């Protein structure tokens, strides 16, 4: 145990000056950036192992010295607004489909089928309504008043973001998620679930209660937010440049350089509206077959067999 602590202590001291400088000044960074790094720093102090040190270094370069793209920022700032337009699929609707393999969003996402993106719609659904919200019963109003088309008074919903901005942001979020799902080696969680809300049925065949459905939307949005920001953040070009300079620093010893290469092995970028693998990561893993040429995919399959 003592020898292990000494090795870890030596490894920490051998970290690049950029990393150590950021850690020493963590409290000078914006509060929203401090959280992840302080959490990892506390974990390392409580249990100083190579694994906790890697997580600390990862947090410094992927959170403290990095900035999330706009769509992730909006997801974190306006989760309730986005949840109201979040795509979903009812379990009973899957049972009614002629060929769920071609039209079920849940199945398409489970198979990493790109058609899953085409089936998405971002419309205001009927859940997560304001308190005391009531949908007018037009037939009942007509029976009582004898007037057709008369609307009852109801609470007006006010969104903190324009609906079009919400839909644009959701489109980018789901493209971001699809990129990670089809490149699992980039992810802390290797097998990602479908990002849509899956609404189940009760044993009697009816849909589950609305309050439970509300919670499904809230939980799903939080899960996706944590995954895109905390667990698998995308690097800015500046953050990538810093990591590249560290990995290529000739003064780093072999063990420390290996640690940084491990940290950088999940690097990817968001440029000009598209996601791409960073050169820092390309040497560390193989992309999903969907992103490989046919010849390369066949060669890898043959090698695997």
Swiss-Prot record:
Matches recorded under InterPro entries: Gep5
Cellular component, GO, one term: mitochondrion
Transmembrane segments: none
Biological-process GO terms, alphabetical: mitochondrial genome maintenance
Protein location: Mitochondrion
Record keywords, A-Z: Mitochondrion
Function: Essential for respiratory growth and required for maintenance of mtDNA. Required for cell survival in the absence of prohibitins.
Family the entry assigns: Belongs to the GEP5 family.
Record's protein name: Genetic interactor of prohibitin 5, mitochondrial
């Amino acid at each position: 145990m003592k020898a292990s602590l000494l090795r870890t202590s030596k490894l920490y001291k051998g970290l690049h000056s950029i990393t150590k400088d950021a850690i020493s000044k963590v409290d000078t960074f914006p509060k929203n950036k401090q959280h992840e790094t302080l959490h990892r720093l506390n974990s390392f102090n409580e249990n100083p192992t190579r694994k906790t040190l890697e997580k600390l270094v990862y947090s410094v370069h992927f959170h403290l010295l990095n900035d999330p793209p706009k769509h992730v920022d909006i997801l974190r700032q306006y989760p309730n607004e986005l949840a109201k337009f979040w795509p979903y699929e009812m379990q009973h609707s899957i049972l009614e489909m002629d060929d769920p393999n071609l039209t079920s969003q849940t199945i398409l996402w489970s198979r990493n089928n790109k058609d899953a993106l085409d089936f998405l719609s971002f419309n205001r659904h009927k859940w997560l309504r304001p308190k005391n919200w009531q949908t007018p019963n037009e037939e009942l109003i007509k029976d009582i008043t004898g007037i057709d088309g008369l609307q009852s008074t109801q609470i007006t919903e006010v969104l903190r973001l324009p609906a079009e901005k919400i839909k644009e942001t959701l489109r980018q979020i789901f493209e971001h998620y699809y990129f990670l799902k089809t490149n699992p080696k980039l992810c802390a969680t290797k097998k990602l679930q479908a990002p849509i809300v899956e609404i189940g049925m009760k044993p009697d065949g009816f849909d589950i209660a609305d309050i439970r459905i509300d919670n499904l939307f809230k939980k799903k949005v939080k899960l996706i937010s944590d995954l895109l920001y905390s667990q698998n953040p995308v690097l800015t070009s500046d953050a990538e440049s810093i990591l590249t300079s560290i990995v290529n620093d000739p003064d780093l010893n072999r063990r420390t350089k290996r640690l940084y290469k491990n940290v950088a092995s999940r690097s990817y970028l968001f440029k000009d509206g598209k996601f791409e693998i960073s050169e820092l990561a390309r040497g560390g893993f193989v992309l999903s077959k969907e992103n490989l040429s046919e010849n390369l995919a066949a060669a890898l399959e043959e090698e695997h067999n």
